[in-house]
């Protein structure tokens, strides 16, 4: 299992508010933890955080997990003091109704509740309709616009006000698991690599803006700067073991079944083979996801950076993605970190990533 110190760090990371474009709070938490063992820790102008082990080693391996989460942003404050918000990233507005929200105001946190017309007052036809973002507002308890603007301004971001919780069977529930769990796992893999390093220079990256940037956001910037020969992207994928999930379309990736190794059009076959071989050698359970086109992750951008990067995608099964309460297995997280650390030890200057 993950040590208590790592679990404590993970919960601090998950509880930190940091929607896309506003990731500075979780980024600081990540960098503070990285400084406890990494050789070099730094940030960049795009908000990315980087931690490095074996800086004189070769080749360079990039481990990427995006640290941003979906959120909300204040677009308008009306005369009655209600804030009207838009999405940062992809929300199902249905899950927002009645939630408590934590807005990052100019002088600190501002808490509110997301309101909607009560069902008692709706016409019959409206009761059957799905909520739209425009149907919702945020009530911060202000009496009027002037009072609200003392605490909030247009452009202030926010997240759902919830905290990480332990669940039975070594499961963890939190908002921001997509993909702060990937940023955590990248650093946890680096920590394990640091205890028994191989020949490679390994850089863990907590990248920004994945939820809003189709071009790869902060991950593309890091890939251009680091010029890695190999990259492993760590993200989440849909767990297949909750009601309504179609395994014929998604594959079979249950909570607790281990890391999910993607195989497909954008994935370097050499790196995929390294991952599968290492998992079999270490007796780490895993499943395979087939991707016939793009993956909708940072892997899509990283693999075409500079002259091209040998890229793989390792995912952690996640229930209830893009909701206030996502769920993962801590066993899957630990196995993913252990697998990635082992693969990094297997790579050296003679490793040929050319697909043959």
Question: What does each model-found stretch correspond to?
Answer:
Residues 1-356:
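N-terminal hydrophobic/helix-forming segments and targeting peptides
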